[in-house]
Amino acid sequence: KIKKAAGAQSMETKEDSTVIVITTDKLGQGAEDLGKVLIKSYTYALAETTPLPKAVMFLNSGVKLTAEGSEVLENIKKLENSGVEIISCGTCLDFYQLKDKLQVGIVGNMYSIIEKMNSAGKVINIG
């Protein structure tokens, strides 16, 4: 009989507790148009692959991706429909005057964002 080493965690459990933080409405530095294409590709691929993250949180201009008019709403809604928590920073939504235009997920505050990050097995920052 094989025993799991003390402190070992299964890959599935670790991956299931991954939190992704998206802090911009485009991916990378340089050409803005390319950055928008890349964030669209990233959110599409994220929604299509497994294992899915536990949560995706949107901060700063990243909240534009969860609001009316976003080109990636379909991808983010697919994540939410698959059980991924979608959280947008309330202060950020207020700053960009988007709180009433939120189309997916919930409004979070810095306390809920920090709580999610602290309880995550891994945090991936995009932005």
Residue locations for each model-derived region?
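Conserved mixed alpha/beta catalytic, RNA-binding, or beta-rich assembly cores of soluble enzyme
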Residues: 3-69
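Short amphipathic alpha-helical segments and helix-helix/interface helices
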Residues: 43, 73-77, 114
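Short, well-ordered beta-strand core segments
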Residues: 56, 85-86, 123-124
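A glycine-rich helix N-cap at a beta->alpha junction
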Residues: 72-98
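Short acidic-hydrophobic, aromatic-tinged amphipathic segments that line or gate anion-handling sites
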Residues: 104-112
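C-terminal binding/interaction regions
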Residues: 110, 117-125
